[in-house]
């Protein structure tokens, strides 16, 4: 059994919006001069005066990280889970072993240790940045930065 955890910082300046918090957590853990980068790069790129107001969001959530991060997108359809050869755990482990962070959406109704577990639908974004086979858990960040081994 093995374990792997990619660098991820919890103490980022924005935790309310995951589209900012997740990449900032990755970059803070991987950039030596993160505070300088934040002041010189992020604020210049994201806080633009648009029609007399400041616009924080961009259509591409990773836009401000260009040159620092790279992203790939693929969608998993529900019918793929019915395929006998499909191993989602193996795919996640493979991606982490090759230095990739996984970001997506989960319904927390089906995640033990979450407030919504078994009670109500709560679809929210998440980031997986590690795994521990011995304890059969993934290291993840999610809503409100409640960290649990899911």
Language-model features and meaning:
Residues 12-15, 30-53, 85-137:
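Active-site-adjacent substructure of cysteine-protease-like catalytic cores
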Residues 133-150:
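Noncatalytic regulatory segments and standalone regulatory/sensor domains
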């Amino acid at each position: 059994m093995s374990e792997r955890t990619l660098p991820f910082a919890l103490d980022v300046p924005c935790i309310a919006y995951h589209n900012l918090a997740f990449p900032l957590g990755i970059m803070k853990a991987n950039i030596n001069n993160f505070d300088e980068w934040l002041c010189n790069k992020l604020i210049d790129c994201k806080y633009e005066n648009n029609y007399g107001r400041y616009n924080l969001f961009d259509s591409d959530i990773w836009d401000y990280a260009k040159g620092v991060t790279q992203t790939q997108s693929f969608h998993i359809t529900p019918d793929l889970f019915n395929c006998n050869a499909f191993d989602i755990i193996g795919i996640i482990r493979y991606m982490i072993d090759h230095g990739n962070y996984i970001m997506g959406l989960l319904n927390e109704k089906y995640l033990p240790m979450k407030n919504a577990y078994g009670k109500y639908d709560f679809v929210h974004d998440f980031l997986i940045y590690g795994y521990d086979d011995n304890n059969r858990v993934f290291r993840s960040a999610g809503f409100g930065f409640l960290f649990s081994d899911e």
